[in-house]
Amino acid sequence: LTVNAMAMAEDGRLIDPYGGFEDLKKGVLRHVSAAFEEDPLRVLRVSRFRAKLPWFRIAEETKAMLRRMVESGEVDALVPERVTAEIRKALKEANPSIFFDELEANGFIARVYPEWKQTDFSRGLLDRLASGFTEEEKFAASVASVDPDKLLNLLESLRMPKKLTEFAQLFSESLRDGFENAADGKSVLSVLRRKDALRRPERFAQLLRLLKAAHRIDSDEKWLTSVEAVRSLDFRSISESATDKSRIPQLIEEASVRAIDETLDKLTDQH
């Protein structure tokens, strides 16, 4: 890019053979020469630059070149791990949704990841998460609008770390399964087990935080206190006191449901 092709001479003179300073003043991202096409990873890097500096725009001739690089199949040869690395960097930028907008505009998404659709919901959520949220949360937001039937195929092709793909699947499921409507001890316990909340309470708390950011739940209090109520039970004591050992699972189930019901009653009284 012309803005990256400037240098300062020892005597303080600006060395600017391609007009980078003028492009910098105007906020324009412009390629230097036809050699730009030699590295198809630049399709992603320029898009990421836009997400980092949203007040810049891509020059029309550079946009055309990016589209040619996609249409010619140059991007098909990209090593998936290099693509994944660029995506992960883009998720850390100030306006990550712009990265995906640019990749849609130049045809990269349609050609390489046709399942990866963005909507106003996923774009808005992604940008709300730009500051103070984790990589898992941002990646989950970026695939929030993907058809659930196509999500696994997309995740496999992206080759993201396991913790990112698992959390993305959990969030996608939680957007659609109506879990938030659980209102009594038995149904809440079923949700906690389905979300693996009792074994992985930190991840569940992270999920709730993201669901609040997505305006899917108003509060996480019911869920966090229910997790704490069950995890604080003395399962060993329950097991040891059972005269019929075959009933231990049922006794634990009943104690867990009771603990959650008591918690829900307290919350109702408080509010």
For every predicted segment, state its role.
Residues 1-160, 271:
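Glycine- and charge-enriched loop/helix tracts that form the active or gating conduit
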Residues 102, 115-271:
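C-terminal subdomains that position terminal phosphate/3'-OH groups for nucleotidyl transfer/ligation
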